[in-house]
Structures are given as structure tokens and as C-alpha cells.
Amino acid sequence: RGMSSAASDVYKRQSLKDDPASIGRRTNFATVYLLKKEDGSLDKVILPIHGYGLWSTLYGFIALEKNGNDIFGLQFYQHAETPGLGAEVDNPKWKAQWKGKKLNNDSGELMITVAKTQKYKDHHIDALAGATLTSNGVDNLVKFWMGESGFKKFLKNLQNGAA
């Protein structure tokens, strides 16, 4: 294929059969950020994420440690969720829960969850009080982007030194 044809693939969007994040379509490629230490070694991986909450699409980033499994943080930069309820995704106390949590268990199964009840300590984020649909949306979008239709293959390649 010619260069212009390959370049245009970057902007192609594909429909999703399994769409828990309610985004309808996703691009074939995404910009990821690899933060490096002064010595050039990998420090953090920052991945773009988005998905529907209650009133809006939440756009943000999830930062992972270099192992691609330990969460360093989650930040949304755009949303229109209800102030005092779903907009609590911006609350520093709620965001602090993400640091140190693990995406996957030792078998590589995606386990991270946003829920009212704690199932697995290393993988649990408390749901937002009074904002069930926003909490479900965050849970769904994180699972989507960290799963098979999202960045799972990239993260596995990263862990194997192939990314």
C-alpha cells in the first residue's frame, strides 16, 4: 500500500460489536505516552480512555507503572457529569484510590472494578455515592480500554519488551 493509504488507516474508525463503554466506534490507532527516566528506561505508560457516564462522554487518561499492570492514576479532563455526584470523578480523594491498584490478577485476567461492594482488594475502586450510572460508566470504560478491544495486546507486548 502507498504511504497515503497507510496514513489514512490511522483515522479509520471501526464499529464495535462489544461496546460496554458506549462509544459506538473506535479508531484503529491511538497515541500513547511513554514517560522515561533520565537514563532512558521506561517509567510510566499513559493511555487515553473515554466512555459514556450518565450525561456525557468522559475523556481522560489512565497512567500505569512500567509493568503495564499497576495503576499510577486516573484523570478525566472533560465530562459533563452532575456536580456533587458523578462529577466526583474529579475528587482527589476518589482518584487517590486508583494508585497502586492492579488491572489484572496473576493469571492475566482483567480484574479492576468500580463497585459498591469490595470483591478483590487489589482490584477494587469504591463506586461514587449517589452516582451509580457514572460509576458503572467508569467501570465499563476502564474495562473496555484495558481489555481485548482496547490496549490489552499493547500492554502484553510492553510487558514482553516488544512495544
Locations of regions flagged by a protein language model:
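Short N-terminal edge-element motif at the start of the domain
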Residues: 9-31, 35-36
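Structured beta-strand/loop patches that form or line metal/cofactor-binding pockets in enzymes
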Residues: 30-61, 78
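Intrinsically disordered, low-complexity polar/acidic regions
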Residues: 34, 40, 113, 117-122, ...
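Extracytoplasmic/luminal low-complexity segments enriched in Pro/Gly and acidic/polar residues
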Residues: 121-126, 130, 134-163
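Single conserved hydrophobic/aromatic residue that forms the stacking wall/gate
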Residues: 1-7, 11
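Hydrophobic alpha-helical segments, especially N-terminal targeting/anchoring helices
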Residues: 3, 36, 64-65
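Flexible, solvent-exposed short loops/turns enriched in glycine
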Residues: 51-58, 67-124, 128
